[in-house]
Amino acid sequence: MIEIFAHRAIFNGIENSAKSIPYYKKLGIGIELDLRYNNNQVYISHDPTNNGDFFEEVCKQYDKSSIKLALHIKENEALNPTIKILEKYSIKNYFLFNTENFEYSNLVDKTKIADYVVKQDQNIKAKILWCDELQNKWYSEKIVKNLHKRKKLIYVMSLEVLEKCDEKSVYLEWERLINLGVDGICTKYPEKLIKFVKGDLN
């Protein structure tokens, strides 16, 4: 069964909100969150602002849940405090990625690091891959099979996360990604993707 991640834990039209956690715990799918650091606090926000919910509030509500957390570290300063919060609440089902290629500290379990992959010939070291085709279309059945032979987990960004598109284009993209055999999809429409995977979407 393909894994599903809610992009920025979107809930009732609001992104990166701690209020989404009970909903996605009940739904049983993963969430992707953007993490930043300011005033000695890790907070969730795509943009640099002090108005985001604290990441610790997310972890308090997580409470022994099994849903997977995809944590986008937006600033290097957020890294070590994030690890300490995860350890404080004994959260194990997560991975970290960043798009700036900064180095991870020794506090980070190397098995929890995902490589951010944007092209076919990129040097890949991690077991977990967080991928997109923003620059060009590079996914293929051959590439996915080869990565799986190397024991890689392939998580990809859905089309509507990367660009404006209509619903039909999103559904066609989901079909392509599923047929390619990727392990998970991050989407703005997690409920619809659940139905799509089950064949229940009219």
Residue ranges and their predicted role:
Residues M1-N202:
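Phosphate-group recognition and catalysis centered on beta-loop-alpha active-site segments
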